[in-house]
Regions:
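Extended intrinsically disordered or low-complexity regions, especially N/C-terminal cytosolic tails and loops
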Residues: 1-105, 151-158, 162, 178-238
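Short, contiguous, well-structured surface segments enriched in hydrophobic/aromatic residues
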Residues: 68-83, 101-140
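Conserved short aromatic-hydrophobic micro-motifs
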Residues: 110, 164-167
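Short non-catalytic regulatory patches outside canonical folded cores
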Residues: 115-162, 169-170, 175
Length: 238
């Protein structure tokens, strides 16, 4: 297990803070674009705000690691017991892993719920009323329902989907047919070997994927076909 350092966590926190700032700008822009609609309900706005919340919570987790969990003084003041350096490292690594998996799950859930809602509004008959498996949903939405296909978007979501599915098995990839899989995204091949742990899902990877998800989501909700829907798209998950 790689030792966590305050410097490493601080760098990750700065990266995520920069993305949060971009997310602030995204949310303001989408609220302005759909100014006549209720921002807490309309699915085009909540598509951004749900991700905004996820990124914010994950940034807080990194700040907690940086400011508190990796500092012995916090343990003395709050836990009221002596903790060895190895104990602090072990618990901090466990918290980091837990927070990273929550980041993946929440990002995936936000995208999935938003894409299903948007597809139903664009075509209520597509993908069994938006209830088919998620790969069918995002391929249909991105490839055939928008005015322009967002470059590399299906590869990005294939990658996120397979990573998220591996989270269900504590980071080990399994598929019902026993087959391996691979995704090529931005020129890099990510391999998923059946029955083996995936070894590339660190914080840097998660933050990079999340930032690209952020850009994709804004691209989708700004698409002219989505903008042409002149009624409220109710998000029951908001």
């Amino acid at each position: 297990m790689k030792q966590l350092t305050i410097q490493d966590i601080q760098k990750l926190g700065h990266r995520l803070a920069t993305i949060r700032h971009s997310m602030d700008e995204d949310l303001d822009a989408i609220k302005a674009l759909y100014a006549g609609l209720e921002p807490r309900i309309d699915a085009r706005i909540t598509a951004i705000s749900k991700l905004h919340g996820t990124f914010g919570m994950s940034h807080l987790c990194l700040m907690f690691l940086h400011k508190d969990l990796l500092n012995r003084s916090w343990w003395v003041t709050n836990i009221k017991q002596r903790a060895s350096e190895s104990d602090i490292q072990s618990l901090a690594c466990s918290f980091s892993s837990y927070s990273r998996m929550a980041f993946i799950q929440s990002t995936f859930s936000s995208v999935e719920s938003s894409f299903r809602l948007l597809l139903r509004e664009l075509d209520s008959s597509a993908c069994n009323g938006g209830t088919s498996d998620f790969k069918s949903i995002y391929e249909c939405l991105l490839k055939s329902k928008l005015s322009q296909y967002p470059t590399d978007s299906v590869d990005l979501l294939d990658l996120l989907r397979l990573v998220r599915n591996s989270v269900h098995n504590n980071g080990v990839y399994f598929y019902r047919t026993g087959q391996d899989d691979a995704v090529t995204w931005k020129g890099h091949i990510y391999n998923f070997k059946h029955g083996f742990p995936i070894d590339f899902v660190n914080w840097d990877f998660c933050i990079t994927v999340a930032d690209n998800i952020r850009m994709l989501m804004r691209n989708v909700v700004e698409d002219s076909n989505i903008r042409a829907i002149d009624r409220l798209i109710i998000d029951p998950f908001s």
